[in-house]
Regions:
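Structural detector of well-ordered beta-strand residues that form the stable sheet scaffold
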Residues: 106-110, 182, 222
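A glycine-rich, often tryptophan-bearing local segment used as a flexible ligand/cofactor-contacting loop or short
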Residues: 89-160
């Protein structure tokens, strides 16, 4: 090998050592809290490999948590935290304070399905983070979802009208006028009054939101009511819906200006 070739060879190795890790650098870091609970205990076994594949496909680092232990440490290293069928009430004491500090420092939160059922008497801050107080839901039924905001990443992969089977949550009035709804459900496509004996559900009328986003207390919050049954986590369109919310919550990017 000539001296010039040797120099070129050494430079190539040096470049590979420097450039290789940079090329493999993942774009952001996400904590997924998926804690089984009374009515949602089977979903996580299906969701975990689906989220792992999502992380590989979209090149982000994911930490999966079956319990609240990650909230015992500083959360600043995460760009977004996903409460996957996991209500805020799972967090206790200082864990709650760490989440509040994280959001106030500009962190992103994604709340999925069961996470929307907050208990205002236990943690009013988390219910305001969700944006609306939960009321009830009827039996699982098929309904038609309508995209009302095409400009948000969580709707980019969705058809304008989307046939979907889930629990259709009902809520009270929003805590803030700043909630930006991206999906609604057409109540004429299912029976909003079909509920267990002794309970009452009456729907929300023409404007029944199922997904929205807002900025709250310094952080970026994406909320979707979709995601009750385990089978839904095998649906590629649904997973793109979730990823769109994660992407925005983690980066603040992707909203198309009208």
């Amino acid at each position: 090998m000539t001296p010039m070739n040797k120099i070129a060879f050494l430079l190539a190795i040096a470049y590979a050592l420097v450039a290789g890790p940079a090329y493999a650098q993942q774009q952001f870091k996400v904590l997924v809290a998926a804690i089984p609970n009374k009515y949602h205990n089977d979903y996580a076994v299906v969701a975990k490999p689906a989220f792992e594949q999502m992380a590989r496909r979209h090149n982000f680092e994911m930490t999966w948590a079956w319990n609240t232990m990650p909230f015992d440490a500083d959360l600043a290293g995460y760009d977004a935290i996903v409460f996957l069928n996991t209500p805020g009430e799972e967090l206790k004491g200082e864990q709650r304070q760490r989440l509040e500090n994280y959001v106030r420092a500009g962190g992103g939160v994604v709340a999925v399905h069961r996470a929307l059922i907050a208990t205002p008497d236990q943690w009013p801050w988390f219910e305001r983070l969700i944006g609306r107080p939960f009321r009830t839901h009827p039996y699982i039924q098929t309904g038609v979802i309508e995209v009302v905001d095409r400009n948000f990443p969580a709707t980019f992969a969705l058809p304008y009208r989307w046939l979907w089977t889930d629990e259709w949550y009902e809520y009270g009035e929003p805590y803030s006028p700043d909630l930006k709804v991206v999906l609604t459900v057409d109540e004429s496509t299912y029976d909003p009054t079909l509920i267990w004996p002794g309970q009452k559900a009456e729907g929300m009328g023409k404007h029944h939101p199922v997904a929205w986003y807002h900025r709250f207390d310094g952080g970026r919050i994406f909320v979707t009511a979709l995601g009750h049954t385990p089978e839904l986590y095998n649906d590629s369109v649904y997973l793109e819906h979730i990823y769109g919310g994660i992407y925005w919550a983690a980066t603040g990017r992707g909203i198309q200006r009208k």
